[in-house]
Amino acid sequence: MEEAASQSLEEDFEGQATHTGPKGVINDWRKFKLESEDGDSIPPSKKEILRQMSSPQSRDDSKERMSRKMSIQEYELIHQDKEDESCLRKYRRQCMQDMHQKLSFGPRYGFVYELETGEQFLETIEKEQKVTTIVVNIYEDGVRGCDALNSSLACLAVEYPMVKFCKIKASNTGAGDRFSTDVLPTLLVYKGGELISNFISVAEQFAEEFFAVDVESFLNEYGLLPEREIHDLEQTNMEDEDIE
């Protein structure tokens, strides 16, 4: 009797152990579906397939199951489970998007603003909301790095819609004598009406050819960009792929 009880305890333990990983969680979910469904509404053949898929198998049983062909009913059931998991992933992504919309306070922009005058430049700095980070590129046509920086900021404006990216020609600032071609492009960063960072001849920080990812890394080194909103959604997708 003791040996039988011990063997039963070991079998129970092994049965629980098969449900510890992600696949075990899915098996438990299948078992839950079987138990929660109305018994009269499930065909006996489908009920048996669900039972087999949710029950732990010994090695011999696994070999036997692998050796036989998959029935049409099994294929349809597995396909249905995959559709259920796909719906679950879509639901989680929608929840994340709703959360981001609720937590993303303040205005949203999404493109680079062209400032035409010094007055418009000052008005942008002084009247924008205090929580908004403003990145301004002071440039001139034909100066090395200016076009590349403007293109990079246009890409970043899409990735960081909560940041206001602007550009203005040095000759339009009203202080053109302070912004000679030797110091262009100059990148100024404001928040709450205050200058928090300035980078003179910022193109010298990059290679001959540089792109948005280079400018993004540079600004992140100084903590000037918020966390990208898409980050959490990508992480959720990675977790969903791990479950599969």
Curated annotation (Swiss-Prot):
UniProt KW Phosphoprotein keyword: yes
CDD domains in the record: Phd_like_Phd
Cellular localisation: Cytoplasm, Cytosol; Nucleus; Cell projection, Cilium, Photoreceptor outer segment; Photoreceptor inner segment
Residue ranges of the region described as Thioredoxin fold: 109-244
Cellular component terms (Gene Ontology): cytosol; nucleus; photoreceptor inner segment; photoreceptor outer segment
Chain intervals with Basic and acidic residues compositional bias: 58-67
Domain Phosducin intervals: 1-244
Phosphoserine: residues bearing it: S71
Keywords: Cell projection, Cilium, Cytoplasm, Nucleus, Phosphoprotein, Sensory transduction, Vision
InterPro entries the record matches: Phosducin (IPR001200), Phosducin-like_reg (IPR051499), Phosducin_N_dom_sf (IPR023196), Phosducin_thioredoxin-like_dom (IPR024253), Thioredoxin-like_sf (IPR036249)
One of the Pfam families matching this protein, by short name: Phosducin
Post-translational modification remark: Light-induced changes in cyclic nucleotide levels modulate the phosphorylation of this protein by cAMP kinase.
Gene3D superfamilies recorded: Glutaredoxin (3.40.30.10), Phosducin, domain 2 (1.10.168.10)
Cysteines paired by S-S bonds: none
Protein's job: Inhibits the transcriptional activation activity of the cone-rod homeobox CRX. May participate in the regulation of visual phototransduction or in the integration of photoreceptor metabolism.
Subunit note: Interacts with CRX. Forms a complex with the beta and gamma subunits of the GTP-binding protein, transducin.
Protein's recorded name: Phosducin
Organism: Mus musculus (Mouse)
Native organism taxonomy: Eukaryota, Metazoa, Chordata, Craniata, Vertebrata
Gene coding for it: Pdc
